[in-house]
Amino acid sequence: MLTGRESLLRLIGKRRRFLPNRHLLLSAHTPNSLNLEFNDYGNLVSLAGDDCRLSEDPTSSDDPSKFSDDLSLSTRKKRRLTQTTLLQSSFLSVPKQLEDGLVICTQQKSILDSETFEFSLVQRSEPSESICCKVEDGSCSPSREESLKTVTLDEDNGEAIETFIVGRKFSDVQDLEIGGDIFLLRHPENVKDRNAIKVISGDSEMLGYLPKDISQCLSPLIDDYDLKFEGTITSVPKKSSEAVLIKVVCHKMRSDGWKECELYGDFKPLWEKVLQVVEHQMQFPPKTTRYQLNFNVLLQEVLRSCSHLFTADEKAFLESFPTLSEDSQRLFIRLYTRKGPWFRLSNISYPEVTDSLQALKDLTVRGFMSSVKDANELDNQKMKEITELLNVTELRDILSMNKVFSRTSRKRDLINSLCSCYNDGTRINLATVILERTGLCAKVSSTAESLIWRVERLFFLNGEQDLSSFVLLDLGIIKYPTYKCIDSEQIFSNRTKLLAYEEAIEVAQLMDESLDNEDPQTVLKCIIIAETRISSSSLDSAHAAAFNRFTAPWVNSKVVLLGVSFFENQKRYNRAVYLLRRLLSCFNCDGRRGYWTVRLSTDLEHMGRPNESLTVAEQGLLDPWVRAGSRVALQRRILRLAKPPRRWKTPTFSNLVDNKIPEVTIQGRSLNCEVGIKNRFYGEDGEQCGVEQLALQYYSGEGGGWQGIHTESSIWLTIFGLLMWDILFSDVPGVFQTRFQTAPLDLETESFYLTRKETIESQLEKVANGMAEEILIISYETQRGTACRGVAWERFSLEELRAAVACVGGMCIASLCRHLAQDYRSWCSGMPDLLVWRFKENGYEGEAKLVEVKSEKDRLSEQQRAWLLLLMDSGFNVEICKVRPASLIKT
């Protein structure tokens, strides 16, 4: 895989089915900054026309077809996407009011031709991609209209609230009547819910319970303030097992009792919480499925906090979703979370959707879905997509009708044969035949796809999380830490910046797809687009460092860096050099500058320019953003290149770089010694093992009786997370934007340490003074299982973590944590493979050693070397363990 592609995949997340700007990005003219004349140094010397040739290779040009023949992309593995089924969760929010009537027509303009991006919603040129929906006053079903009643205050009898009776399976009475009297009774003996509240009939018969969310808020008030509730049944469902709508009133305990209750400090906020929960529940009654509730909460949260990023028409369209019927909402969410893009109605069946056909019709009318049932509605693209819905048997049957016979059982080959028939005008109308097989087909409309994708992106702020995150939370598979979301500045201050960011992610996805499809023309096009977007852009210095990753220039820089790897893989180093210089000139304060500088120096050397390579390396050491492994790499390059007559003076850092790291060599019986394959050995017990396990066996035996584990960076990031837990999740404005974060947004920036310097240093002083183990135990026991960046709960026991902290020592642990706090991004990887320790006879004091294990043909990376040198300087006991295969003895 090309360097930088894995990072790009994480940025993209789940691929979008519809890219609004795909055609415009690939067809519009883009200033070709790579269509330039280079000299032997890889420097731009003059503008060139379309026939420009690179000095490195006179046969190459910027026409992708000129160099596509020698691309070696066939070894790239295609990414597989997995689909998560939504289940349940609980996530509350107060929704916006719905607008009654609207008409929406949408279109997105190109943002290629100007610096200012103005997207408006107007009629699309393709009828199938346009939406026109009208929300009538009576669009809500009767049951939903009834559930949208507001909470009122009855001045004579007290506070009236509307809610439901649930848990009807526990009822003593099956048949209920509208107007029947009811009373509320606490049920603290309920072993499943100590806050349970029973609903009792006028004859003292059990009717069910109040919903759990309301009981949780209301039960403390009943217990502490002796509140009494009675009311009536206001609606009876068709099925006796369904929830029953009721209205209950809290009577005054005496003539002035209500005001007396309000005098207590805790009463008012608790009662307001009850009203909030009641209001939310009436918006989403018990019959609302969990994934349906989560989806609506997603919409409401984003529309509440990011309304300035949507046009009036877009907001109206999204706000119309809750007015859809229950079936329509459920069907849309189900289909949106599936791969698609097209679905056969005959294959759509969900137990919670009673009428899929009617739901689909409603969704199509309202613009959330597009459907096709007439062959005249199919163009070539839709035709290709719908053929994917046919199975192998259906494909063979259709081909046989055209007297095309194929022995292959591969679906892709059959589809290609079918499409070739469709392109041949002499054949029968395949569109009609295919639709006869598939029946009515539907897909999520492009407008809904684009807007819901934006909502998810704004809610989760990444491409790796989606609606399935609610499922993980509800099932207890993941537990998020407790923190406060303190608003400061907006991540996207205006719509223009958001649209530029979205377009950059589109370019990134196009780049990824083109690499999968071995399409060099599109690869080059994406590189050019991304390079053009950063040519006149740089990260806003006033923008918080934690928010830089949400800018278009930052995303485009990821595409450009992948382009560097692409050109390096093709040995077109002058193009890679040009792109690296563009990155270095546009991003002056970026932790990636170190890697870019190393690549620039290396590529210049590949071009036969050692003097310039040396100069770049020397200038890189003056850059404060060149750190950790990149800094060591440049120092080692300088020592290698700065030989007389290029340089006569020995660099001052030569002694530091050449600092001797202790080594030990052991032998093992090798199972394989092939280059490029991870070495396997026979362990002391005769079982196969890796090189790290073999080293652990050595240290536990003749190496000195050490205990140990194979940890790499994981144990140190875990210790850092536990020791700094309260600081990581402290109240800092702006760093927590969503409820699904495992770390503050600024963790990998300089601002993390600078903003919290006083508290960090205070905590590190405690660690250095011997309190590390105590802090570790408290964090481990109180936060166990809670997700936190870097903390690997499943890998290490508390005993192993305590041993590591106790044997390494407080001073060393504090030094390591300080480096991670100051520059987490640079130091979060590359730590030694093994941690070994042994206690002294008293059982409390001990010693530890960090070991980097290398096989015979393996060598240290620059990041690993940087860590070993840093650890030695901080007082750690470190060692390199080299494993060599033992000589084979013939018997």
UniProtKB/Swiss-Prot annotation:
E.C. code: 3.1.4.1
Binding annotation for Mn(2+) 2: 712, 833
GO biological process, one term: homologous chromosome pairing at meiosis
Pfam families per UniProt: FAN1_HTH (PF21315), FAN1_TPR (PF21170), HIRAN (PF08797), VRR_NUC (PF08774)
SMART domains: HIRAN (SM00910), VRR_NUC (SM00990)
Limits of the VRR-NUC domain: 770-884
Primary location class: nucleus
Cofactor comment text: Binds 2 magnesium or manganese ions per subunit.
Cofactor dependency: Mn(2+); Mg(2+)
Enzyme class: hydrolase
Compartments (UniProt record): Nucleus
UniProt catalytic activity: Hydrolytically removes 5'-nucleotides successively from the 3'-hydroxy termini of 3'-hydroxy-terminated oligonucleotides
A GO CC term attached to the entry: nucleus
Molecular function via GO: hydrolase activity, acting on acid anhydrides, in phosphorus-containing anhydrides; nucleic acid binding; phosphodiesterase I activity; zinc ion binding
Keywords associated with the record: DNA damage, DNA repair, Hydrolase, Magnesium, Manganese, Metal-binding, Nuclease, Nucleus
InterPro entries in the record: Fan1-like, FAN1-like_euk, FAN1-like_TPR, FAN1-like_WH, HIRAN, tRNA_endonuc-like_dom_sf, VRR_NUC
Domain of life: Eukaryota
This protein's record includes keyword DNA repair: yes
Binding positions for Mn(2+) 1 per the UniProt entry: 833, 852-853
Function: Nuclease required for the repair of DNA interstrand cross-links (ICLs). Acts as a 5'-3' exonuclease that anchors at a cut end of DNA and cleaves DNA successively at every third nucleotide, allowing to excise an ICL from one strand through flanking incisions. May act upstream of the helicase RECQL4A and the ATPase RAD5A, which is involved in error-free post-replicative repair. Functions independently of MUS81 pathway, but in a similar pathway with RECQ4A, RAD5A and MFH1 in ICL repair.
Family membership noted in the UniProt record: Belongs to the FAN1 family.
Protein name: Fanconi-associated nuclease 1 homolog
Organism: Arabidopsis thaliana
